[in-house]
Regions:
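Hydrophobic alpha-helical transmembrane segments of multi-pass integral membrane proteins
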Residues: 15-23, 45-61, 79, 137-140, ...
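Loop-to-transmembrane alpha-helix entry segments
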Residues: 75, 108-111, 124-147, 154-161, ...
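Specific transmembrane alpha-helical segments of multi-pass solute transporters/efflux pumps
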Residues: 63-106, 111, 147, 226-244
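Helix-helix packing/entry segments at the starts of transmembrane helices
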Residues: 107-113, 178-198, 230-266
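Hydrophobic transmembrane alpha-helices of multi-pass small-molecule transport proteins
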Residues: 58, 88, 130-150, 167-171, ...
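Specific alpha-helical transmembrane segments that line the substrate/conduction pathway
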Residues: 45-56, 88, 96-127, 167, ...
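C-terminal-most transmembrane helix of multi-pass membrane proteins
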Residues: 2-4, 51, 150, 218, ...
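Glycine-/small-residue-enriched transmembrane alpha-helix faces in small-molecule transporters
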Residues: 2-48, 86, 94, 143, ...
Length: 305
């Protein structure tokens, strides 16, 4: 009797887990389209507005979900939460700059290297073992990256690619910091990253003489991204990841990478270069191969910048 009632429940949990995680990837994949639709604001102004809405959204969410202040949870996690929060600020900044200065396809594919960077950092910092298959996948991914940046030997596009890799490194540090703090709870650290971003971007805007007032269109898009693109995506991922193994999470995360370039092609007519497509295919093969080769420890999600 017990097995008959448990099996459908487990199957339903898996089904909804797949649905929620895929939906999170769909929301995260809109980051490129959102930034492309912003007309005048620069990276620091976009990040400021997005961080304000994200922080307010997560504060309410954490209070409702846990019944306690996010600051209580941050104190519980300790210094790793600070490291995680600061690393996300770097990741967000690099991500927005990358999308503004290279193709969305190129940026999104390079963001996807974050799990490989996290594996290497985990090995160095936490002495976590790395499977042989992961090392092979990392080598293949490096080859794909080389192909992608081969036609960007100079100029703004190369800076965008470097910023995208820097963003991926920031997300990798975030992942390792949460493992260091022995917590799978990402929301308090993401909330803290929003507060850090507000302070840092406000100071930069003051220093550069940038206006704190954006056009209704730019401000609305940036704040909408904080709630819907980042915040709602986090909720769906948190709900779905509880019932899925790490290998499935890694495969479902590819939805974000694949759909991001699709949106800007459909709505804005933006295309990718041949090098980006070929190198991206190699990179995606490395990610998928690593996921299929065996289950890994379930990592916190790599959120869209």
């Amino acid at each position: 009797m017990t097995s008959n009632t448990t099996a459908p429940s487990t199957a339903d949990a898996h089904k909804y887990g797949v649905l929620f995680v895929f939906a999170a990837g769909v929301l995260w994949s809109t980051v490129g389209l959102g930034i492309r639709l912003i007309e005048d604001a620069v990276v620091w102004q976009i990040l400021l507005y997005r961080s304000i809405s994200l922080s307010l959204f997560l504060y309410v969410l954490i209070r409702v979900r846990s019944g306690e202040s996010p600051f209580v949870q941050i104190r519980r996690i300790g210094f790793p939460a600070v490291v995680a929060g600061l690393s996300l600020v770097a990741a967000y900044s690099g991500g927005i700059y990358a999308i503004q200065n290279t193709s969305v396809a190129n940026a999104m594919l390079l963001f996807a290297t974050a799990p490989f960077m996290a594996a290497v950092l985990g090995k160095i910092v936490l002495r976590e073992p790395v499977r042989a298959a992961t090392w092979i996948a990392i080598a293949v991914a490096i080859g794909g990256i080389g192909i992608m940046v081969a036609d960007k030997s100079g100029g703004v596009a190369l800076k965008g690619s470097i910023a995208a890799l820097g963003s991926a490194f920031g997300f990798a540090v975030f992942t390792v910091a949460l493992r260091w703090g022995r917590t799978g709870e990402m929301l308090p650290a993401v909330f803290l990253s929003g507060l850090f971003a507000i302070v840092i971007t406000s100071a930069i805007c003051l220093g550069l003489g940038l206006s704190f007032v954006l056009s209704p269109s730019d401000g609305g898009i940036a704040m909408g991204m904080g709630v819907f693109q980042v915040g709602a995506g986090l909720i769906l991922y948190t709900l779905g990841s509880r019932s899925l193994p790490a290998a499935e999470l890694a495969l479902l995360s590819l939805a974000e990478v694949l759909l991001g370039p699709l949106w800007v092609w459909l709505f804005l007519g933006e295309t990718a270069t041949a090098n980006t497509l070929i190198g991206g295919a190699v990179l995606l093969a490395a990610i998928a191969g690593n996921a299929l080769s065996g289950k890994r420890r379930k990592p916190p999600p790599i959120t869209a910048p």
